């Protein structure tokens, strides 16, 4: 057996011809052709949505090969040092718990966007490169290519643009805004960058 995983879950693959597994190692990207079958009732796996079916492999094509030993096991990536996880982020994102966090965040943002729109708010994006403004943290600055010695600041919050919109008559505005603050890490946000519903 092998477990075939994609964005949507895991499927058990039955290998009846051992030669199909020649050269196959963990975390390779595979294309498997075969026959989908119902599992015998005593082999059902209620822990996964595909637990009543399995794929009998007739052909396996390797789409992406693994040439080196993996730096960590995918299912335990959350226990690994953060610098290692970030270096191999493409592997860390294969961990179901990490993926589920990203999917959850996407659903929350979609929900907020729909709710605000339903209440008559207009979604407006404000500029990212702007003048520095007096906020609570230090600015991240971006040098101007055109104006030597001049700098843009990344917004700590879209406050000034929100006030411009309100003064212009946009009374129901929202955005899911990136905010950039050159400050130390906090328990509730990443150092330097976070998103907020404004």
What are these regions (language model features)?
Residues 1-198:
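Class II aminoacyl-tRNA synthetase catalytic cores and aaRS-like
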């Amino acid at each position: 057996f092998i477990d075939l995983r994609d964005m949507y879950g895991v499927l058990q693959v039955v290998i009846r011809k051992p030669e199909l597994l020649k050269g196959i190692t963990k975390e390779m990207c595979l294309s498997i052709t075969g026959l989908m079958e119902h599992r015998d009732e005593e082999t059902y796996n209620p822990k996964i949505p595909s637990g009543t079916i399995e794929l009998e492999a007739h052909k396996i094509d390797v789409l992406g090969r693994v040439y080196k030993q993996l730096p960590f096991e995918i299912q335990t990536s959350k226990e690994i040092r953060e610098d290692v996880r970030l270096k191999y982020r493409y592997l860390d994102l294969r961990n179901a718990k990490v993926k589920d966090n990203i999917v959850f965040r996407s659903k929350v943002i979609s929900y907020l966007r729909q709710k605000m729109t339903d209440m008559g708010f207009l979604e407006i994006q404000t500029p990212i490169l702007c003048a520095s403004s007096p906020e609570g943290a230090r600015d991240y600055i971006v040098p101007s290519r055109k104006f030597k010695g001049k700098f843009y600041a990344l917004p700590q919050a879209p406050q000034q643009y929100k006030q411009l919109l309100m003064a212009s008559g946009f009374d129901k505005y929202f955005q899911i805004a990136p905010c950039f603050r050159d400050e130390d890490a906090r328990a509730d946000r990443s150092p330097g960058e976070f998103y907020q519903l404004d």
